[in-house]
Structure formats: C-alpha cells, structure tokens
Amino acid sequence: MAGKTMIPLLAFAAWSGTGKTTLLKKLIPALCARGIRPGLIKHTHHDMDVDKPGKDSYELRKAGAAQTIVASQQRWALMTETPDEEELDLQFLASRMDTSKLDLILVEGFKHEEIAKIVLFRDGAGHRPEELVIDRHVIAVASDVPLNLDVALLDINDVEGLADFVVEWMQKQNG
C-alpha cells in the first residue's frame, strides 16, 4: 500500500450520546478548509455491514470470500470478514490506509488506545465531570461548560477553535 509514513492519529473519545459524530461532521470540513486531508477510523460496538443484501458483492462475500473489494469510479471499499478474530487494534487499521492521501487520521472511539485524544464532555448528557478519564494521552477536553483540568479546555461548540487547536497540535507533531 502506498504512503506508509507515520502520520498523526488523533482520537475523539466520549460516552455514547455526547456528540462525537456530530462534532466530527463539522470538524472535518473545517480541517479541509485549512488544507488538511483527514482520514477517519470509526469504532462501533454494533455488527455492521457496508454492503446490502441482494447485491452481487454481498452474495459473493456471504458465499465465503474472506475479503471483498467493491469498486466504482467514485470510491472503493475493502471488507474483511473477522468473525473469529479478536478485536483489531487501531495501529493495524491505520496501516490499511493510504497515508499518501492523508495528513491526519481522526479516530472516533478507541478510547483505551494509547494515542493522543480529545475527550468530549457535555453537561446534561448523563455523566459528571468527575467521571472523565484524563490520562497522559489526553491533550484536551472539549466541553460546553467550564471545567478545572490540567489539560487544555476547548469549547465543544467552537468548531473553528477546535480546528485551529488540531492544526497547531499537528504542527507540533511534525516538529
């Protein structure tokens, strides 16, 4: 696979319902506007399928193909069957990406991975600030309320400010 140089991985970690996907849907265009080419790895606890029953690719995969690539002029997707394997680790998944097309890999979830992360907190989402896990990998907390923390505190509703923070963090990673 082309472009196997290491690029920064930055996770966004939070409890379900905090708005990780909602935030990333706004942050990704803001990063693109700054000339950053982001990739994304999203963790899900649910059984998922990017293919549809009845489609040829779905039927061929269900017939026993261990890996299937579905390709069109606009995009392609690789599906790998892993029912008997332990959960894949994030570094393996990142190694599957063509980093020659990326400047940054954003990660939704994988909160226990030892990579840089921004933890999200929303008041009224069912948790208390005291429950936040701030370890050595947390570079900031994005919140909608003031918090007294030993890491950077960002406004979760200020997408432009978050994008600026991410760009500055990336520049520090690149020396």
Swiss-Prot record:
Belongs to the MobB family. Keywords: GTP-binding, Molybdenum cofactor biosynthesis, Nucleotide-binding. SUPFAM superfamilies: P-loop containing nucleoside triphosphate hydrolases. The lineage of its organism: Bacteria, Pseudomonadati, Pseudomonadota, Gammaproteobacteria, Enterobacterales. GTP-binding protein that is not required for the biosynthesis of Mo-molybdopterin guanine dinucleotide (Mo-MGD) cofactor, and not necessary for the formation of active molybdoenzymes using this form of molybdenum cofactor. May act as an adapter protein to achieve the efficient biosynthesis and utilization of MGD. Displays a weak intrinsic GTPase activity. Is also able to bind the nucleotides ATP, TTP and GDP, but with lower affinity than GTP. The keyword GTP-binding applies. InterPro entries: MGD_biosynthesis_adapter (IPR052539), MobB_dom (IPR004435), P-loop_NTPase (IPR027417). GO terms for biological process: Mo-molybdopterin cofactor biosynthetic process. Induction: Is expressed at very low levels under both aerobic and anaerobic growth conditions. This is Molybdopterin-guanine dinucleotide biosynthesis adapter protein. It comes from the Bacteria. GTP binds at G17, T18, G19, K20, T21, D51, K52, P53, G54, S100, K101, L102, D103. Coiled coil: none annotated.
